[in-house]
Amino acid sequence: MAASSTVTLCTRLDFCYCVNSDYRDAIDANVARVRGLIAGHKAQGKAIGYLSVPLSPAGGGSFAVNAEIAAATASSVTARLGAQSAWILNPGAEGGDRMNGAGGADFMYMWTQILEGRNGAGEDFDFFYFAGPFDFASFFKLTGQGDLERLEAWFDARAAQDPSFMTAVDNGSITRAGFRNYYGLRASVAFSYGSHDDWNIARAINARRRGAADFGIANQLAIFFDGHPVTPGSYEEPTAAGDAGRCVK
């Protein structure tokens, strides 16, 4: 079997990724599918959001747990805004069933196209929501008292009840201390490769909107972090790239 090849692919706003060419058709198909999903909700008059949330286990977390947190956060944001009036795109739920084994750059090339929209102004979206420490704390029911100990207890209970989680513990892909420290000290978009790119995408979209006669400052994307609106001085600043970057030959 021939080895997979990689290729640099760039989006309308010039975000470039080193993409595994085996996933190009799957990416194109899911971009079209998710755009259709968004269009259906827009046709109902809903405000459309995007949830930026860590999904990778990088740093000590668990993909399965992160996916559960993403779903819980999406549900919480939807409840806050009203399900009849808003819909939020959860990347943990809409990654596509043909993307198994894909890497971060493959996923980000896909999400970047969806977020930018056909015109590069993020015209399908009204707001971005970046998950933060309090979103994670809410999932684990942390109280601000003995939080790391609560996370250790949560880890022990999950390992006792979930065979796949216990398997990950046994093979060393997740550890009690790593889990505790990640979710207790670093659980946030601040430590996510993909979310770093999401932030820069939101910034680029708003920069384009500010300079467009049909958008302008008044019609920028609303940006939320950890449940609160972000100030203009913050969301106009870039952050370090995550998965974005050209292939190195």
What are these regions (language model features)?
Residues 2-249:
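Conserved catalytic or regulatory cores that recognize and/or transform ribose-phosphate-containing ligands
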